[in-house]
Amino acid sequence: MSEAAVMPWRRRASEKSLAKEGRIWTLWSAGVIVTFSLPAALLIWVEPLAFPVAVIFVGHGIAVLHLQASRGARGVKPIGDPETGPERTALGLLGDLVGHETRELLQETGLALQRGRLGAWLVGQEGAILVRPGGHRVHCFCVRVAEGSDLPQADRVAHLLLALREDEEGFATVANRNFSGARWRLRLEVAKRVRPALRQV
């Protein structure tokens, strides 16, 4: 992927780098929990009647984790219902591109499924979800199509899908990761329409 060549400061994505990033995100999440839970526990120990305040404190920590997962969910925008001729044409061409096996999933969820060496990708208009082998961890990537916002929605997905097929590791290198964590955390934040896609991969 040519975009990866102009970003030499980014280490090329690989199985090893994705595993490392996953561990970093897990440590960060654990750090958030500890940061908010320890003072809450200390507060209860000092003054048991302060339990409601401690609960609010822990709630703030949980909210931070939800906000991070929500950010990942917002970065992957599914295709909406086609309203114009060009939109319907683009969706038809995208359906041919993904093949019969995943066309039904595309129509149902608005995301295109692409299986690769790094895992299963669910591609939307402005990014993609990578479900790692085993299905327990996901990485959310945000990436914009350079040609602009006047393209039909399905064309934007097609551009990202073709880039992913051309160079999977390059795609993961260029795209901006905005969440990594357990699949169930992301499933709580995505639109109901998208959830079947996460269940199927």
Task: For the regions a language model picked out, list residue spans one by one.
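N-terminal alpha-helical membrane-insertion module
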Residues: 1-74
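Short amphipathic alpha-helical segments that mediate assembly, nucleic-acid/protein binding
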Residues: 11, 99, 154-155
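N-terminal topogenic membrane-targeting module
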Residues: 61-119
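Cytosol-/stroma-facing membrane-proximal "stalk/adaptor" domains immediately downstream
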Residues: 133-201
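Phosphate-centric recognition/catalysis
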Residues: 123
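A short beta-strand signature
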Residues: 126-127
